[in-house]
């Protein structure tokens, strides 16, 4: 299963075609289509299930995403972060399991050595937050993770199996400090 509270809520846009269970990311507002969203930071108070979101332009909001009145406040706060011409935020959705890009519970594992190699190649320090990974590993050679498919490793009591590579999208081209496109990480 995924990590607790990882991508537990998402904002569906007005053109979403949601079905019970897992839904593809194209149904939700996301950084690939709305770069300003990449500058949103989040913190969760597990006891109250309240989430605080902060953005350098939109400011800060604290909401309980499961409460209908709070959902309206959240949608109103998020709307200015969506570019003109894009489907507007319409509903807060709770997935029950992590709403990742795969239709099975998953955890994304990336390598700090690969990040350092890409940063060097691009001539800039790239933030780990561009990739929204669950786990960052150190000690491997750059790009070694590409050969990990089929491998298993232990993390505490959990055993993780690498089943596929992550296909990256344009969200990684956005500076998470500013929400502005900066650098072609996909080249």
Where on the chain are the PLM-derived regions?
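Metal-cofactor-dependent catalytic cores
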Residues: 1-187
């Amino acid at each position: 299963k995924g990590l607790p509270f990882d991508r537990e809520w998402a904002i569906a846009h007005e053109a979403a075609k949601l079905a019970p269970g897992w839904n593809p990311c194209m149904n939700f507002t996301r950084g690939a289509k709305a770069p300003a969203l990449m500058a949103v930071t989040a913190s969760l108070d597990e006891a109250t299930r309240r989430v605080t979101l902060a953005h350098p332009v939109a400011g800060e909001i604290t909401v309980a995403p499961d409460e209908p009145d709070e959902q309206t406040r959240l949608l109103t706060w998020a709307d200015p972060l969506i570019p003109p011409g894009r489907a507007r935020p319409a509903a807060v959705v709770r997935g029950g399991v992590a709403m990742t890009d795969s239709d099975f519970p998953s955890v994304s594992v990336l390598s700090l050595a690969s990040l350092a190699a890409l940063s060097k190649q691009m001539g800039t320090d790239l933030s780990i937050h561009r990739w929204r990974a669950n786990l960052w590993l150190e000690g491997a050679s750059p790009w070694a993770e590409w050969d990990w498919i089929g491998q298993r490793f232990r993390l505490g009591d959990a055993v993780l199996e690498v089943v596929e590579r992550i296909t990256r999208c344009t969200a990684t081209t956005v500076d998470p400090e500013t929400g502005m496109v900066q650098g072609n990480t996909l080249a």
